[in-house]
Amino acid sequence: MQEQYRPDLLEQEVQKYWQNNQTFKAVKDSSKEKYYCLSMFPYPSGRLHMGHVRNYTIADVVSRYQRMNGKNVLQPVGWDAFGLPAEGAAVKNKTAPAKWTYENIDYMKNQLKMLGFSYDWDREIATCKPEYYKWEQWFFTELYKKGLVYKKTSVVNWCPNDETVLANEQVHEGCCWRCDTPVEQKEIPQWFIKITDYAEQLLSGLDTLPEWPDMVKTMQRNWIGRSEGVEITFKIENSDETVAVYTTRPDTFYGVSYMAVAAGHPLAEKAAQNNAELARFIQECKNTKVAEAELATMEKKGMATGINAIHPITGKPVPVWVANFVLMHYGTGAVMAVPAHDQRDFEFATKYGLPIKQVIAPMNGEEIDLTKAAFTEHGKLVNSAEFDGLDFEAAFNGIADKLEKMGVGKRQVNYRLRDWGVSRQRYWGAPIPMLTLENGDVVPAPLQDLPIVLPEDVVMDGVKSPIKADPDWAKTSYNGQPALKETDTFDTFMESSWYYARYTSPQYHEGMLDSDEANYWLPVDQYIGGIEHATMHLLYFRFFHKLLRDAGLVSTDEPTKKLLCQGMVLADAFYYTSPTNERIWVSPTKVMLERDEKGRILKATDDEGHELVHAGMTKMSKSKNNGIDPQEMVEKYGADTVRLFMMFASPAEMTLEWQESGVEGAKRFLGRLWNLVFEYNKNPVKTAPNPTALSSAQKALRRDVHKTIAKVSDDIGRRQTFNTAIAAIMELMNKLTRAPLTDEQDRAVMGEALSAVVRMLYPITPHICFQLWKDLGNEDIIDFAPWVQADEAAMIDDEKLVVVQVNGKVRGKITVPADMAEEEIKRVALAEENVQKFLDGLNIVKVIYVPGKLLSFVAK
């Protein structure tokens, strides 16, 4: 064994062993319990960042722990390789997106290998490879045949100068990122998948996921947004036309004072034909893209159409307004406005002087002031004809019944969830496998024509997609007839919605999945990724699994049993202000700090002498230049040290503050472990400790070892509190470094302890533990060594500490044999000098004994 811990040499050797022996290759074995652990795969942006390292380290700890517990572990890796950043990088670097992507994959793959993750590299996937997206294209055509795919017009960002569609990220303050032309909203035909057909399943399925974070489930419930209400039909005055609205508050129906419709609603467009001012307002609304999240805070604007609807029950006219807060693609594109009982309606009515009629009163009879705000709570009805006095539920049902009997309303369950628009007018994505025939018919591409391959050797001009710019690419045939390929590509969430399933049979060429493999490995046992994916990826991922199930490809209802959402990685951010008043952000690696005795920053300067402002701990980002390069850290400290710090510095779900002093501490800890094994190995023993021959000090140390094993096993396996597991190992290590190695039983206890520590740390710091396991004389390889088990007998305390109180105050502590009787414990306590002092001259009137913990004397 080498005397010095040299991670730079050791880690390369261990990684070479793993690679040469395919140690982590996963093979289906029905005789073994499987465990599928998966991290959300990375976008190949060029370099790993610390957020990646944290995510993948957590997954690797879980994988290695489960492997030591005898499970057949699958931990695959791949690349979410399509996406807009590749197009921008290709234009900037005068290269093709494919070339940029594949170079990044090669680079990042080496970075992952440096960190020692136990991946089955034979299952590696890159979603931009035709052999992957072929099956995605095929599945889309199958969904089309089942009626789950359709095409309709939808709004996009349109640059009229470049005549191209822009992604949201390419719109800067309402203008095109390239030419600064004001962006318009344009309707174009796009493909959709009917996720709404699965809304109820997606909602109810959340109740079958007890090991998902409650926050993620709540976010999905809110996103799906199930509501029970009534769809009501209003007639238009002096017309045969009608307009439908949906409301969850039919109890407020008598308080409707106006109707608001979206700019794209047929009523609005009809009214605009003879009203130039209204036409201009409608165009302004259409050119302002509004995210649903902004509706609550944006300025409410509207204009009267001059059209009235007729209230179905009262027969009174209801003026129709065009309003910028009503979206055409949500609900019916029209809402009934009850300003007395909806705050948004109230603000609009107040602004434009529209009537505010109270129809709900508080149940307790209190007066409300409708000049200040709407009363939005449930209550009892007033000013509502025969429904006066009813509470919410009775009024809901009473008014719904009346509307249904009149033939102008129907009870309805609605969802906030909208169908998934999967068309993207970008180049770097999987081509959508639909063909347009000369007669205008649209048909799915047949399997024998798949994959429709995206050309990779292209020149990007930053304006048009190469497959849209090249008319020859789209030309094809269908049953001998000329046809045109679709030039839109799939939303990249398509690829990430089923990759986890393809990992079970990545080289399978006969179909999308080998169902035998898929049904052995699925569902995923542990999935790990950021909570920012809660309502997009994690919802599409669940939806796709149900589609795969209904196609007979998988047999389970949900894709993963357990979900862990790791916290962000933060780092100090520093800047100085340039002569032009611009903030120049400086990398923390170039900052010199002066701190006070409590570690607080007093002064920060960079290597050019600028005095810096400390902007605090913020998420690592390019914009603040505070990212820490994992590769630099691995080269400086070793992969095990980086992994140990990542797992120790914070609970997995919480934010982690990057502190290089903490990384240095992790390196010192591993050095101490190495030194301890080195010292022990000068005179090791082969025999296990003999419990009957141990001194009380040796028993106490052994008891600490086995209590630590029990705690660490629970912390890693059940609680997933990896930081507390490491803290317990560090506490044990402090005791081991102080323990003597004088006689054989000392060394036997130490040998058992070191064997346990090395196995407990192995999932976290596998390289050093791989070597130390061999150095401790083990002939097997630690990768498949069994997880260390706690010895129940060793954990039993021979002695117990009893706190002694007199009149409620602690006056002594006594250590007594664990089996000592209560009367004997009293006798020992009363012999204590300090206890005698506080009982002197008093009579004991009561004795309270809590077995093994507390003896309390009440004296007068």
Curated annotation (Swiss-Prot):
One of its GO terms (molecular function) is ATP binding. It is found in: Cytoplasm. It catalyses: tRNA(Leu) + L-leucine + ATP = L-leucyl-tRNA(Leu) + AMP + diphosphate. Its EC number is 6.1.1.4. A motif ('KMSKS' region) lies at residues 619-623. One of its GO terms (cellular component) is cytosol. It holds the Pfam family tRNA-synt_1_2. ATP binds at K622. Belongs to the class-I aminoacyl-tRNA synthetase family. PANTHER family: LEUCINE--TRNA LIGASE, MITOCHONDRIAL (PTHR43740:SF2), LEUCYL-TRNA SYNTHETASE (PTHR43740). This is Leucine--tRNA ligase.
